[in-house]
From Swiss-Prot:
Gene3D superfamilies: Aspartate Aminotransferase, domain 1 (3.90.1150.10), Type I PLP-dependent aspartate aminotransferase-like (Major domain) (3.40.640.10)
GO BP: any one term: L-serine biosynthetic process
Binding-site list for L-glutamate: R42
Subcellular location: Cytoplasm
Nucleotide-binding recorded as keyword: no
Binding site for pyridoxal 5'-phosphate: A76, R77, W102, T153, D173, Q196, N238, T239
Lineage of the organism: Bacteria, Pseudomonadati, Pseudomonadota, Gammaproteobacteria, Pasteurellales
Protein name (database record): Phosphoserine aminotransferase
Length: 361
């Protein structure tokens, strides 16, 4: 099928130029006559790849030199455990800001390793979900760290401002909005993100960790989750997912070649504005997130009728608009418009939404 647009929440759409490059090199990488999947992860060419990937990602995201970039396995869920094992070893407790499913899931996992205080910071006003607090400077320093998820993929709730935690360590699960816009990395102790939405394919998680937070893991921390061990081993204490790492490196190069984070931010804002502007004009579809907390990456909407929603998803799929079904815990529809989604994809979705409305209103 031609002109297919993939709105999946993850694994998500990859940049077409990256897929084409990977296809071209699949059987003969770096003139070696073998695939990148077959070469030694400690060989000359792959070591050059990871060095360049670190450099490119650091340039793209303006990551300070006093931060390490780790390319690990286990996804964000693995980091739900790794974070407390590496950080919660002084005061013995952590604060988790709850804005939805993934922040709550992270808090639940952390309770296996430390005391957790969980604070719900969303509320419903006039049927809309909004974040009601971002200043925690009065309580944050009693904790080893403060954790939050700035973009809840399921509901489409996003925190657009960095929470104020004073001098406490701020940790962010940015799996679904990393590299969506410019960010002051220095405000964070740790940022982690599964690659499968904005950075590459599934199979790798990127952890940006401030160097002074490395080296404090509890004794029982498995080496695979120990940031010091991984940093000292170039993220390779075991054989890494080399093909996923390679694809991430291609994504970084593609972003740099096409304007970097400035261009990404402008295009993402344009795509989100197009879709939300339409949702605000129609009475057929509804978005239930307050405007100031609407996600730029995950746009949720519903007709209010489950059968009509199912019909929408089925017909959209036939029209080449894939993976628009909402998460099972939230329902409705969800359009994930990550970095690789072109403006044309959003325009095609809006055109279909208008057609469906005209036929079913």
């Amino acid at each position: 099928m031609s002109n297919v647009f993939n709105f999946s929440a993850g694994p998500a759409m990859m940049p077409p130029a990256v897929l084409k490059k990977a296809q071209e090199e699949l059987l003969n990488w770096q003139g070696q006559g073998t695939s990148v999947m077959e070469v030694s992860h400690r060989g000359k060419y792959f070591m050059e790849l990871i060095t360049q990937a670190d450099k490119d990602f650091r340039e793209l995201y303006n990551i300070p030199e006093n931060y390490k970039i780790l390319f690990l396995q286990g996804g964000a869920r693995g980091q739900f455990a790794a974070i407390p094992m590496n950080l919660a070893n002084n005061k013995g407790k952590a604060l988790y800001l709850n804005t939805g499913h993934w922040s709550a899931t992270a808090a639940k996992e952390a309770r296996n390793f430390t005391e957790v205080d969980e604070l719900n910071i969303t509320e419903q006003i006039d049927g809309l979900t909004r974040v009601n607090r971002l200043d925690f400077s009065d309580i944050a320093e009693q904790y080893d760290y403060v954790h939050y998820c700035p973009n809840e993929t399921i509901t489409g709730v996003e925190i657009n401002e960095i929470p104020n935690v004073g001098n406490a360590v701020l940790v962010a699960d940015m799996s679904s909005n990393i590299m969506a816009r410019k960010l002051d990395i220095s405000k964070f102790g740790i940022i982690y993100a599964g690659a499968q939405k904005n950075l590459g394919p599934a199979g790798i998680v990127i952890v940006i960790v401030r160097e002074d937070l490395i080296g404090h893991a509890r004794k029982a921390t498995p080496s695979i989750w120990n940031y010091e061990v991984q940093a000292n081993a170039d993220s390779m204490i075991n054989t890494p997912p080399t093909f996923a790492w390679y694809l991430c490196s291609l994504v970084f190069k593609d972003l740099l070649a096409n304007g970097g984070i400035d261009t990404v931010e402008k295009r993402n804002a344009q795509k989100a504005a197009l879709l939300y502007d339409y949702l605000d004009q129609t009475v057929f579809y509804h978005n239930t997130i307050a405007k100031e907390n609407r996600s730029v990456m995950n746009v949720t909407f519903t007709t209010g009728d489950d059968q009509l929603n199912a019909k929408f998803v089925a017909q959209a799929t036939e029209a080449g608009l894939q993976a628009l079904k909402g998460h099972k815990v939230f329902g409705g529809m969800r359009a994930s418009i990550y970095n690789a989604m072109p403006v044309e994809g959003v325009e095609a979705l809006i055109a279909f939404m208008k057609k469906f409305e005209a036929e079913n209103a």
